[in-house]
Amino acid sequence: MVKLALVVAEFNYDITHLMLQKALEHAKFLGAEVTYVVKVPGVFDIPMVLKELALKEDVDAVVTLGAVIQGATKHDEIVAQQAARKILDLAVESGKPITLGIIGHGANRMQALERVEEYARRAVEAAVKLARRKKLLKEAKYGGSTVVID
């Protein structure tokens, strides 16, 4: 069974709370166990807890959930781009899947609400698939014919 940690931004919590509910439902549907749910103030703060979660033995993958709503300035672009870059850096550094379930940048509140289920489900599904496939890859051995991990 894949063990997941979920990191949820509290900013725009009317949206991210719904994302959390959908993510928990989809994890259960896929047969994954959610071992941690960590709430952080905003999307920009998500990377602050990722390394700690990735080091835990009872976490196979981490799902990030957040919503960056377009404002009057370019602030949403900076937040979303920097968070996404650091999330990927930490995934590569830790060797554990950390998936991006962050709506935005450029989305307005209505668009974000329309994308809640899609983004939450995709992030959970990617985390579960990556965790399972990494385990299969670790156990796989080449024996003269192509090894396919799917």
Swiss-Prot record:
GO biological process: riboflavin biosynthetic process
Binding site for 5-amino-6-(D-ribitylamino)uracil: 11, 43-45, 67-69, 100
UniProtKB keywords: Riboflavin biosynthesis, Transferase
Top EC group: transferase
Catalytic residue list: 75 (proton donor)
Binding site for (2S)-2-hydroxy-3-oxobutyl phosphate: 72-73, 115
Record field: catalytic activity: (2S)-2-hydroxy-3-oxobutyl phosphate + 5-amino-6-(D-ribitylamino)uracil = 6,7-dimethyl-8-(1-D-ribityl)lumazine + phosphate + 2 H2O + H(+)
E.C. designation(s): 2.5.1.78
Sample GO molecular function, one term: 6,7-dimethyl-8-ribityllumazine synthase activity
Domain of life: Archaea
Family annotation (Pfam families): DMRL_synthase (PF00885)
Family, similarity comment: Belongs to the DMRL synthase family.
HAMAP family from the UniProt entry: Lumazine_synth
Descriptive protein name: 6,7-dimethyl-8-ribityllumazine synthase
